[in-house]
Amino acid sequence: MQLLVAWTVLRTFAALGRLEPVDEAREGIKVDAAPAAIVETHWPETGIRTRPWSPSKRIATMAKGTRLLVRGVVASRDNSGCKGKPWYAVYPFGYICSEHVKPGREQPLVGHALGERMRGERRLPYDYAKVREEGALMYRGVDGVRTGVAARSLSEGMNLAVARTLEVDGSAYVETVDGQLVSKSSVGWLGQGSAWHGVFLTDNAAIGPAFAWSSRDKVPVLAEPAVKAAQVGTLGLRERVDLLEETGEADPDRWWKIGEGRYVQAKNLNEVVFTAIPEGALRDNRLASGDDQWIDVDLGEQVLVAYRGARPVYATLVSSGKGSPTPKGNYPIWAKVASMTMANQDYEDNPYMVEHVPWVMLFQGHNALHGAYWHDQFGKRRSHGCVNLAPLDARWLFEWVAPALPAGWTGYLPADLERSVVVHVRDSSLPPDQAFFQERPIGPPDPEEEKRRQEEADERRAEAAAAAAEAVPAAAAAG
């Protein structure tokens, strides 16, 4: 069993190692024999860097207690990166400061990030609760409760990841995963999220419409493609149907034949349409090497299809941006994060917060593919700009997209986006010349753009405050 575990770990790490190659001889990195074969992280979050010095890019993060295989030790070049202490060269890639780890004895865990939390029939890695009281207070631990000093107040509708419930001086509280306390009476439990999930695709599929899910409950099925035709049945919510023959050119006159003498208006369906590999979604070198994953998101149909080369392998429903539309374009995934708290930016006026959103893949600025535990409206636009997935879909996609994060790892930030899986975002509901174009730049949020938006928000708020101040004496004089 020990040998099997070690072999599985090495196979996983070998696949990861190809992603971040370093020419150590050319860069003068001398790796000597290490005093330890395995190290264990002992900080709440520890980073792996591209080079054994500072500054160098952080490319991976892991939780406390994560074990790593060591391939050697590198003497420190400076005092700032690791306080003059040596670095460990670790598998599958990169270097970690020796101050951040301790010698370990057991092999690294086998499995996926967050996998240790997914026991039994769980669909989510944490228990979640929704704040149902405007102004509910959040405290930094038991001491905060007893001193009465709140860390912040919460808005109704914010979502918390809960570690446990406890009593403090006779009052019940929930303790969040991050160690904050909120009165239990101020929250309501959210359960395990939607049970919805997509489908695996095993057959060689032709390009074009394949099947669909009904977009609501009790969708009428008619005997002919006409609104006044006799009704011969109904479809339940998200019922899957084959798309056999299309009539009409535009809604509401577009219909699909789904069986003999059975027709449904296209506007009542989320259509799954397979497409050829779009330009820019998959580079030739990746296709030739077998690193051929890419993801198609159709905003018009609210459908996601995962591909390997020209072959679709999985399809499901999503919820994309509503008030803030999801940007169209080709976007390489710039970060994979096992879970992260999402909240409004300082320049946004409407506060929101959802703690420990699971299985996050950031593809453009703040926009991400991620699990959504707070709603069950997949197939409809709903988000702030991200692409929401049901929990089961989010986990599958996160583990499928290379690289798969090993157990204990909390994040991966590729040094070179050329190797990242591309998310191709289009909108089939728009005319062809508007359905796809590169709407935003690739990669993480642009600091200059963030600064500009913050300055605009500060100016807007200052003007509003000045107007409110002027209104007070005017109202008093009128009274």
Predicted segments with their positions:
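Cell wall/extracellular polymer interaction/catalysis modules
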Residues: 231-232, 241-328, 441, 449, ...
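An N-terminus-focused feature that recognizes amino-terminal "leader" regions
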Residues: 22-80, 158-159
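Sec-dependent N-terminal signal peptides of Gram-negative exported proteins
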Residues: 1-16
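SH3/SH3-like beta-barrel superfamily modules
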Residues: 59-104, 150-188, 233-270
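Short, structured beta-strand/loop micro-motifs enriched in basic residues and often containing a Trp
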Residues: 44-53, 136-145, 217-226
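Boundary regions of SH3-family modules and the immediately adjacent low-complexity/disordered segments
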Residues: 16-39, 82-134, 143-145, 175-216, ...
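Extracytoplasmic
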Residues: 34-36, 43-45, 83-87, 171, ...
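Exported/periplasmic cell-wall-interacting domains
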Residues: 288-290, 324-330, 335-479
